[in-house]
Amino acid sequence: MRGFSGAGNRFVLVDEREECAGAAQRARAPRSVRDTPAAADGTLRLVPPRVGGDARLEITNRDGSRAAACGNGLRCVGLYLFERGEIGARAARIETDAGERTVELVRRGLAGAVLRAGMGRAEGVSLSSPVEHEGERFSARAVRLGNPHLVLRVADERRAPVAVLGRRLQSHPDFPDGVNVGFLARRDERWHLRVFERGVGETHACGSGACAAAWALCVAGEGAGCVEIQMAGGRLSVEFDPTGELFLIGDAREEDPAGWESPRGRP
């Protein structure tokens, strides 16, 4: 069991791909999500690939629910594979519940690395009703990027009702399995984002949430090519290629879970 952080998003990683290594890992691996460090946002479990990738990634949220994809987790897995010498200079191919994703190394640093993860194409979702809270109606866009996301525009994300509204929207009729809710604001000439993640709550960063916010900005004509999103855990960049695929760029590093704050405070 090893600890990794992607832009402040913390994960426990367990590699079960090799039979002998898998047995040793399983002996030390958390029996359930409740056994992971309280400060971890989820568990990244590597198992043998099914269709020729370097690994298959199974993502479990803090509450035990399954996530189809995770941009910050993908970069952490990519760093792990690069550090083990499994990839070399090529991009890692990682199978997820949302399909195959690629991760490539941008540059190394003393405290970690910057990596670029392919996030697939965004699929817009029509909302059946407006999003309102305490008499305020929000400008909202919904999108699927492996996981469902709802992006709300706010004047100042620091004052947004993230916990209250994020929790209430988990029962929104358009998202029967829950939804990640982003609160996006333009402040100090930067885009700032807070995300209430389904199965976790508010986190220091959400990679697919940053991609959803960048997509919403592009649809609104306020972003193109590359969009930078500032979150509590750091800055993430989202690129669009001509085919419409999104790429998430940000840091990843290995950390000792024993040194993580527990329980973790709000971002």
Segments predicted by a language model, with ranges:
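A glycine-rich beta-to-alpha transition motif near the start of alpha/beta enzyme domains, typified by
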Residues: 1-111, 151-267
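Short, solvent-exposed secondary-structure boundary/capping segments
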Residues: 111-119
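Ligand-binding beta-strand-loop-alpha-helix segment within the catalytic cores
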Residues: 121-125
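Short amphipathic alpha-helix segments
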Residues: 126-130
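Internal active-site segments that recognize and position negatively charged phosphoryl groups
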Residues: 132-159
